[in-house]
């Protein structure tokens, strides 16, 4: 985690809204456990539709700025109210995203999750296995270097096994075997506006998408 992220977490961790079913997850939460890379944003997941009437004023009270999500238009077209599904803020240069776990696979993962309190405050951080499983869902749905890198770190630290990965892959993409998963990963292409992966805050060496993908495929083949 960067110093900016740690400062942002310190500002939000005692907010009363985190007494609700909101959980710290994502790449930054994963790095809290395994310190595998620099992570520069904060993801908060909810098992139910976002209580935006509580979240928005609470975040504004600590001088966070609300920003629009790129999926707002698509959500409106689907007849949904965007603020119930995703809310994004910037706090001291750190992006903080609240999102509703509306996919069936995400809901199933959260049913068996556990958590602990971040620094003994109101903010709850999910257990490392649940964070990892949710990151796998993200990996299957989008093209991001950070998702690929995080997946490799999960394999390296033996957080999840292939036997635990495949049910998630089948539920999300009908991938039923390790061989099918390898083909899926090998076919991944870098997104046009991909976010860089850094291992060190002071020495920001950017790892390429193809380099990360090659490493992950080799790890999965072992």
Task: Give the location of each predicted region.
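Compositionally biased terminal segments of proteins
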Residues: 1-222
């Amino acid at each position: 985690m960067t110093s900016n992220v740690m400062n942002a977490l310190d500002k939000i961790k005692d907010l009363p809204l985190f007494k609700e079913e909101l959980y710290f997850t994502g790449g930054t939460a994963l790095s809290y456990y395994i310190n595998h890379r620099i992570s520069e944003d904060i993801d908060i997941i909810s098992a139910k539709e976002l209580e935006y009437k509580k979240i928005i004023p609470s975040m504004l009270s600590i001088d966070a700025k609300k920003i629009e999500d790129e999926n707002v238009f698509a959500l409106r077209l689907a007849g949904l109210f965007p603020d119930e599904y995703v809310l994004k803020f910037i706090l001291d240069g750190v992006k903080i995203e609240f999102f509703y776990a509306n996919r069936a696979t995400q809901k199933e993962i959260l049913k068996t999750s556990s958590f602990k309190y971040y620094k003994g405050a109101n903010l709850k951080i999910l257990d490392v296995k649940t964070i990892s499983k949710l990151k796998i869902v993200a990996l299957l749905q989008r093209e991001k270097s950070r998702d690929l890198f995080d997946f490799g770190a999960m394999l390296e630290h033996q957080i999840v096994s292939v036997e635990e990965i495949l049910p998630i892959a089948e539920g999300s993409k009908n991938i039923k075997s390790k061989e099918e998963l390898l083909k899926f990963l090998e076919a991944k292409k870098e997104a046009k506006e991909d976010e860089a992966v850094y291992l060190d805050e002071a020495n920001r060496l950017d790892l390429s998408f193809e380099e990360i993908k090659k490493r992950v495929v080799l790890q999965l083949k072992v």
